[in-house]
From Swiss-Prot:
Gene3D superfamilies in the record: Leucine-rich Repeat Variant
InterPro entries: ARM-like (IPR011989), ARM-type_fold (IPR016024), PP2A_B56 (IPR002554)
GO CC field: cytoplasm; cytosol; nucleus; protein phosphatase type 2A complex
Induction comment: By heat shock.
Protein name per UniProt: Serine/threonine protein phosphatase 2A 59 kDa regulatory subunit B' gamma isoform
Protein role: The B regulatory subunit may modulate substrate selectivity and catalytic activity, and may also direct the localization of the catalytic enzyme to a particular subcellular compartment. Required for the formation of the PP2A holoenzyme that negatively regulates brassinosteroid signaling by dephosphorylating and inactivating BRI1 in the cytoplasm. Seems to be functionally connected with CPR5 and may mediate the negative regulation of defense reactions and senescence under low irradiances. May contribute to the epigenetic regulation of defense gene expression.
Keywords on record: Brassinosteroid signaling pathway, Cytoplasm, Flowering, Nucleus, Plant defense, Stress response
Subunit structure: PP2A consists of a common heteromeric enzyme, composed of a catalytic subunit (subunits C), a constant regulatory subunit (subunit A), and a variety of regulatory subunits such as subunits B (the R2/B/PR55/B55, R3/B''/PR72/PR130/PR59 and R5/B'/B56 families). Interacts with BRI1. Interacts with IGMT1 and IGMT4. Interacts with ACO3 in the cytosol.
Length: 522
């Protein structure tokens, strides 16, 4: 009982409870001492110590991230600006550079615009000084400097975005295209940190052999995670930086391609929600352009397993331009891939989305421009069956886009060379358009294409016309017979309905002969 009473009494705080670090090394606190900087330490507190330190002494700055509580940093002491690089001797600039970098490992809370205004401005000006220094430095960056630059990037940039699953099931019922993208409130600092990282990677004073210790696989993966940011400004910086990393760090190239591949797989087959697919494809377009010939099997598999299936998601319009560029690059590199690409397009051809169908037709034209005759012949039958369906589309833009294929000289030459196969496939669709399409522009374009076909081979054209008229007559006869059959069935059923007798219907022959008297079953 006495122990319980004493247990409720407040204890005198021990000296260790005010420290940021755990003497046993548990709870993890990383402290960096900055000599003569006006900052006693920059600390990353554990979850246990952060609460007890939140009401610290005068001058303490607690700066949680706007997006993640894991990035809360603390400054014990006064956050003061360091001397300018102009005010110190050249020999002291490298040390001052590292001190300024360490000073920028503090993350402030930008969700509250009125909080820590002075400290935020000091940090922003310090970051700008660092960017200028890296742009003008004439000596190789030291190992310590590169480590601190990487640390600034990790502390300021890397964070987890909310809603990892993107609530995809809920978003399916919403028109997410009309939503305004969320802008990062900490952008005044993030932008300069990105600029610092970009200058660091692009600088000739950065030794890639040393820098790869810090710009490692883990760093690259976290950088790729940031491509899901809703802020397009951030994605533009990420695109440029990742491209620079790919160019400078050759050892990371296969890993970067594989990591992007995995992002695509997850997007295609799991989430169908990612904000940075267009930017990643833009990087890949440049990478594919630099592929050596002949193409490696790994690169061909990437086309088949990742790029072609990217046509499947509903939101493909958000990145289709970049995707189309990548696809065409592959066909231009290896024309034998044209058949694979065209059959892939046909596999994912939209059925109910007309605007997406127009995009597919545009991409198809670009692919066909790079297609040689041999590959064209392998896929022309299924291809022009789909084009014939597009010609008869009630959506006038789809029909128009399909007819525009005949305006392309290369495609028209391919069609002319294989007109004996293609004309019988598309002729019925053309003829139906001229007779009954509701849109006058489609009718006019169809007549022009019809004229081209007649000039190509008048004999085959006449045969196709005769075949179409014969099929049309047969179809009319079939419809008439079907209507007659139903009419006779109704009359037979009406005559038996008074006596409530079951109506026995004989098996009808192809001539649809009905027994009006006694049947074989009566």
């Amino acid at each position: 009982m006495i122990k319980q009473i004493f247990g409720k009494l407040p204890r005198k705080p021990s000296k260790s409870s005010h420290n940021d670090s755990n003497p046993n090394g548990e709870g993890g606190v990383n402290s960096y001492y900055i000599p003569n900087s006006g900052i006693s330490s920059i600390s990353k507190p554990s979850s246990k110590s952060s609460a007890s330190n939140s009401n610290g002494a005068n001058g303490t700055v607690i700066a949680p991230s706007s997006t993640s509580s894991n990035r809360t940093n603390q400054v014990n002491g006064v956050y003061e600006a360091l001397p300018s690089f102009r005010d110190v001797p050249t020999s002291e600039k490298p040390n001052l550079f590292i001190k300024k970098l360490s000073m920028c490992c503090v993350v402030f809370d930008f969700n509250d615009p009125s909080k820590n205004l002075r400290e935020k401005e000091i940090k922003r000006q310090t970051l700008l000084e660092l960017v200028d220094y890296i742009a003008t430095v004439s000596t190789k960056l030291s190992d310590a400097a590169m480590q601190e630059i990487a640390k600034v990037a990790v502390v300021n940039l890397f964070r987890t975005f909310p809603s990892a699953n993107h609530e995809s099931k809920i978003l399916e019922t919403l028109d997410v295209d009309d939503e305004e993208p969320a802008l990062e409130p900490a952008w005044p600092h993030l932008q300069v940190v990105y600029e610092l990282l970009l200058r660091f990677v692009a600088s000739p004073m950065t030794d890639a052999k040393l820098a790869k210790r810090y710009i490692d696989h883990s760093f690259v993966l976290k950088l790729l995670d940031l491509f899901d940011s809703e802020d397009q400004r951030e994605r533009e910086y990420l695109k440029t930086i990742l491209h620079r990393i790919y160019g400078k760090f050759m050892v990371h190239r296969p890993f970067i391609r594989k990591a992007i591949n995995n992002i695509f797989y997850r997007f295609i087959f799991e989430t169908e929600k990612h904000n940075g697919i267009a930017e990643l494809l833009e990087i890949l377009g440049s990478i594919i352009n630099g592929f050596a010939l002949p193409l490696k099997e790994e690169h061909k598999l990437f086309l088949i397993r990742a790029l072609i299936p990217l046509h499947r998601p509903k939101c493909a319009s958000a990145y289709h331009q970049q995707l189309s560029y990548c696809i065409v690059q592959f066909v231009e590199k290896d024309f034998k891939l044209a058949d694979t690409v065209i059959r892939g397009l046909l596999k994912y051809w939209p059925v109910t989305n007309s605007s997406k169908e127009v995009m597919f037709l545009g991409e198809l034209e670009e692919v066909l421009e790079a297609t040689q005759a041999a590959e064209f012949q392998r896929c022309m039958v299924p291809l022009f069956r789909q084009i014939a369906r597009c010609l008869n589309s009630s959506h006038f833009q789809v029909a128009e886009r399909a007819l525009f294929l005949w305006n392309n000289d290369h495609i028209r030459n391919l069609i002319t060379q294989n007109h004996k196969v293609i004309m019988p496939i598309v002729f019925p669709a053309m003829e139906r358009n001229t007779r009954g399409h509701w849109n006058q522009a489609v009718q006019s374009l169809t007549l022009n294409v019809r004229k081209v076909m007649a000039e190509t081979d008048q004999i085959l054209f006449d045969e196709c016309l005769a075949k179409f008229q014969e099929d049309e007559a047969n179809e009319t006869e079939v419809v008439a017979k079907r209507e007659a059959t139903w009419k006779l069935l109704e009359e037979l059923a009406a005559s038996k309905s008074v006596s409530n007798e079951a109506v026995l219907v004989p098996r009808f022959s192809s001539s649809v002969t009905l027994a009006t008297g006694k049947t074989s079953g009566s």
